[in-house]
Amino acid sequence: MFDFGFSELVVIGVVMLIVVGPERLPKVARTAGHLLGRLQRYVSDVKSDIQREMQLEELKKLQQQVQQQAQALESSVRTEVAQVESSVDQVVAAIKADAAPPDNTTSAESQAAADPAAVDSSQQLELRLDTTPKQVVGSDKA
């Protein structure tokens, strides 16, 4: 705290002995020691308070930085998610467009894709084929 050498302390002690006297010198020295101790404790308390405030200020700055970085990360994630959603929507639309029948197909082709039995009946109608067997009347061979 103070930069005193041994010779300077001896000079101060001799001056105090002359001014205060030998009877009261121990009492004054004890009181000075107590006051010096209080002063040192007060200075250390002030230092610790200042350090605490500085740490709180640093923590607040650090918290703000973390919050800003978190917000930046959140916004970048949101933009990436929006881009992925739009690309997924485009793929879904393309798949739906490929799955839908084209406009230039005939009704028979669309029926063929839907039901093979319907194709047979439509072809039979077009060819006018009869699927039921005819019985010949009068030719009984029994």
From Swiss-Prot:
Part of the twin-arginine translocation (Tat) system that transports large folded proteins containing a characteristic twin-arginine motif in their signal peptide across membranes. Together with TatC, TatB is part of a receptor directly interacting with Tat signal peptides. TatB may form an oligomeric binding site that transiently accommodates folded Tat precursor proteins before their translocation. It holds the Pfam family TatA_B_E. The keyword Transmembrane helix applies. It comes from the Bacteria. Residues 99-142 are annotated as: Disordered. Its main location: membrane. PANTHER family: SEC-INDEPENDENT PROTEIN TRANSLOCASE PROTEIN TATA, CHLOROPLASTIC. This is Sec-independent protein translocase protein TatB. It comes from Azoarcus sp. (strain BH72). The gene is tatB. The Tat system comprises two distinct complexes: a TatABC complex, containing multiple copies of TatA, TatB and TatC subunits, and a separate TatA complex, containing only TatA subunits. Substrates initially bind to the TatABC complex, which probably triggers association of the separate TatA complex to form the active translocon. InterPro entries: TatA/B/E (IPR003369), TatB (IPR018448).
